[in-house]
Amino acid sequence: MPELPEVETVRRELEKRIVGQKIISIEATYPRMVLTGFEQLKKELTGKTIQGISRRGKYLIFEIGDDFRLISHLRMEGKYRLATLDAPREKHDHLTMKFADGQLIYADVRKFGTWELISTDQVLPYFLKKKIGPEPTYDEDFDEKLFREKLRKSTKKIKPYLLEQTLVAGLGNIYVDEVLWLAKIHPEKETNQLIESSIHLLHDSIIEILQKAIKLGGSSIRTYSALGSTGKMQNELQVYGKTGEKCSRCGAEIQKIKVAGRGTHFCPVCQQK
């Protein structure tokens, strides 16, 4: 599943290439992906201009005209690509925005991705309802004190809690494993057992890993690419997908276990319970 760095990379590519484009038409071969109704979306957005592309956590937000926002979630394997108007349709192409000189195509092998059309004034309530946590930056949004308070009030295991998106936005399986390795925290550690120095290191590790991944264009693992461009973060991963290899920090063998049903990679020496 694309995580925050991959979605941000897609956002930046879309921003460079489609902002300012007028939507001539919208087509769907699998209209059920539009949760708010394809016909309404087609009616409201045809003829409108894409004014910007923003992001909240793993969600892309197409800013179209003044009145509407199109919320896109890539889920497991969704991806966008740009093509010429005469490009042949491919097997897993499901949604298309056509412009005067090209088209933006959304393809999804598993059909899990979604589009939702909401009014501009409903964007904030939309994400408040989903309880998406703060963005992982050093500004006031990702407040370390509030982060610490939430961890200390919970008996949840740290990995599944980070995956919930309520503590901080955008973390998925790959980067949670990387963050916990960097912070030297066992993925099954109960959050109320974390000492203050560990929480501080965890807070900063989340920011460091995700910002580094954004800088490197995300991790191109399995099917991910950002409009055809591959990322480089996969070359920097320390534990994810490294089962049986030596930890770069201590030399111990990286292990893989299941935590809350998710494959989890960690160093048994650096990340002790």
Swiss-Prot record:
Question: What's the EC number here?
Answer: 3.2.2.23, 4.2.99.18
* HAMAP family per the UniProt record, alphabetical: Fapy_DNA_glycosyl
Molecular-function GO terms, alphabetical: 8-oxo-7,8-dihydroguanine DNA N-glycosylase activity; class I DNA-(apurinic or apyrimidinic site) endonuclease activity; damaged DNA binding; zinc ion binding
Name the segments for region: DNA-binding. Answer: 58-76, 162-172
> In which family does this protein belong, per the annotation?
Belongs to the FPG family.
The alphabetized UniProt keywords are: DNA damage, DNA repair, DNA-binding, Glycosidase, Hydrolase, Lyase, Metal-binding, Multifunctional enzyme, Zinc, Zinc-finger
Protein's UniProt name: Formamidopyrimidine-DNA glycosylase
Write out the catalysed reaction: Hydrolysis of DNA containing ring-opened 7-methylguanine residues, releasing 2,6-diamino-4-hydroxy-5-(N-methyl)formamidopyrimidine; 2'-deoxyribonucleotide-(2'-deoxyribose 5'-phosphate)-2'-deoxyribonucleotide-DNA = a 3'-end 2'-deoxyribonucleotide-(2,3-dehydro-2,3-deoxyribose 5'-phosphate)-DNA + a 5'-end 5'-phospho-2'-deoxyribonucleoside-DNA + H(+)
Q: Which Pfam families match?
A: Fapy_DNA_glyco, H2TH, zf-FPG_IleRS
Function recorded in the entry: Involved in base excision repair of DNA damaged by oxidation or by mutagenic agents. Acts as a DNA glycosylase that recognizes and removes damaged bases. Has a preference for oxidized purines, such as 7,8-dihydro-8-oxoguanine (8-oxoG). Has AP (apurinic/apyrimidinic) lyase activity and introduces nicks in the DNA strand. Cleaves the DNA backbone by beta-delta elimination to generate a single-strand break at the site of the removed base with both 3'- and 5'-phosphates.
Catalytic residues as annotated in Swiss-Prot or TrEMBL: 2-3, 58, 262
How does the cofactor attach, per the note?
Answer: Binds 1 zinc ion per subunit.
In residue numbers, the zinc fingers (FPG-type) are 238-272
Cofactor(s) annotated in UniProt: Zn(2+)
BP-aspect Gene Ontology terms: base-excision repair
**Gene3D superfamilies per the record?**
1.10.8.50, MutM-like, N-terminal
Residues binding DNA are: 92, 110
Q: Entry's InterPro entries?
A: DNA_glyclase/AP_lyase_DNA-bd, DNA_glyclase_Znf_dom_DNA_BS, Formamido-pyr_DNA_Glyclase, FPG_cat, MutM-like_N-ter, Ribosomal_uS13-like_H2TH, Znf_DNA_glyclase/AP_lyase, Znf_FPG/IleRS
